[in-house]
Amino acid sequence: MGLSDGEWQLVLNVWGKVEADIPSHGQEVLIRLFKGHPETLEKFDKFKHLKSEDEMKASEDLKKHGATVLTALGGILKKKGHHEAEIKPLAQSHATKHKIPVKYLEFISECIIQVLQSKHPGDFGADAQGAMNKALELFRKDMASNYKELGFQG
């Protein structure tokens, strides 16, 4: 399941593009998540009232939360798999407070891949996509493992 040094480099290279504009990337990821999987919107009291894509695009709170999500994920990716200290509190809050199922982490991972494909086609070829998929799968596996330890069946 681990990634090679070369794969981590591909992941971090494209992530550098994300970090150049985290708010717009995060906003687009969340909009894709909510439009593609409307049931996920129910987990966000702050955004439940946003029904249209235009309302979502106009929401500063949604943009801020998208930036928060991708900033946290970037911190995890930069650990190149040695992310236990970052995953534990994230899993704790997502299992006990927010009750976010692992399936929703799969959904948002798909959205992240789609946004990267859309915004950075030249920097996100097949090798980079494969590496990012592996990195996100590792993240989800470790979140699920922590969920299990916490007794959350999400």
Curated annotation (Swiss-Prot):
One of its GO terms (biological process) is removal of superoxide radicals. The modification Phosphoserine is found at residue 4. It is found in: Cytoplasm, Sarcoplasm. It holds the Pfam family Globin. One of its GO terms (molecular function) is heme binding. Keywords: Cytoplasm, Heme, Iron, Metal-binding, Muscle protein, Oxidoreductase, Oxygen transport, Phosphoprotein, Transport. InterPro entries: Globin, Globin-like_sf, Myoglobin. Transmembrane segments: none annotated. The keyword Acetylation does not apply. The keyword Thylakoid does not apply. Belongs to the globin family. Monomeric. This is Myoglobin. The gene is MB.
